[in-house]
């Protein structure tokens, strides 16, 4: 008898109540809770905008110039004067604290805001307690292939980014030679400036290296002073073979 009742209950139970769809319904309820809190926050923002003391109906505000373009200057001036002379102006609000017409609405909205804030706190606490259980998740062959393909794409993208960075670092502008180093760094230099050049001159000229290096420096300074005043850019060496 019990087996018959169990079989009938399984037959009458809808298909979407199967435990396989538990995670789906869990995510659905979380999304609906987020949407409800979003609607509540939007409604609170609109109510706070319309219930502020400085808000007045549209009949008391200056009309747009598109309503009456011919009488725009005078009508705008009249509305502006009426707004200043109106007893419910900003100075009146500052003296009385708030408009009597909207005081009851503000109090009611404050109570509603407190109730909504409590509901949102309860929703956030319940959302924090919810955890996704992945122990019963079935790992199929298609899912394994998907993960492997994703990892392969990530590795290819990482390798391509490294190649692009190396190509950008090794790029030489047309007005620079191959030994021009334009990199800047805040780290201390690995070797003393001119040490490599001094060792090369010592190897080439022996004891006369210092004298020849001084002569080269003098010639270079003279060239920079008299001949290289405007420092023209070198024409890029491009083979013109069409």
Swiss-Prot record:
InterPro entries: GEMIN8. GO terms for cellular component: cytoplasm; cytosol; Gemini of Cajal bodies; nucleoplasm; nucleus; SMN complex; SMN-Sm protein complex. The keyword Membrane does not apply. Residues 110-119 have a biased composition (Basic and acidic residues). Residues 94-130 are annotated as: Disordered. Its main location: nucleus. It comes from the Eukaryota. The modification Phosphoserine is found at residues 117, 126. This is Gem-associated protein 8. It comes from Homo sapiens (Human).
């Amino acid at each position: 008898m019990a087996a018959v009742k169990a079989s009938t209950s399984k037959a009458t139970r809808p298909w979407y109540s199967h435990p396989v769809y538990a995670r789906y319904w869990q995510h659905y309820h979380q999304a609906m809770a987020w949407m409800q809190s979003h609607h509540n926050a939007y409604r609170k923002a609109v109510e706070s905008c319309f219930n502020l003391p400085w808000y007045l109906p549209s009949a008391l505000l200056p009309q747009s110039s598109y309503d009456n373009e011919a009488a725009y200057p005078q009508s705008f001036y009249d509305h502006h004067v009426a707004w200043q002379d109106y007893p419910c102006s900003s100075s009146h609000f500052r003296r009385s604290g708030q408009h009597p017409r909207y005081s009851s609405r503000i109090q009611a909205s404050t109570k509603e805001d407190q109730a909504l804030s409590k509901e949102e706190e309860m929703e956030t606490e319940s959302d924090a307690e919810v955890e996704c259980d992945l122990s019963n998740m079935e790992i199929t062959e298609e899912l394994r292939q998907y993960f492997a393909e994703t990892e392969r794409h990530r590795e290819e993208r990482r390798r391509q980014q490294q190649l692009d960075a190396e190509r950008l670092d090794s790029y030489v502008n047309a007005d620079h030679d191959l030994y021009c180093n334009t990199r800047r760094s805040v780290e201390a230099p690995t070797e003393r400036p001119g040490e490599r050049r001094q060792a090369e001159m010592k190897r080439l000229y022996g004891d006369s290296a210092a004298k020849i290096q001084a002569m080269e420096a003098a010639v270079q300074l003279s060239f920079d002073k008299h001949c290289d005043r405007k420092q023209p850019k070198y024409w890029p060496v491009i083979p013109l073979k069409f």
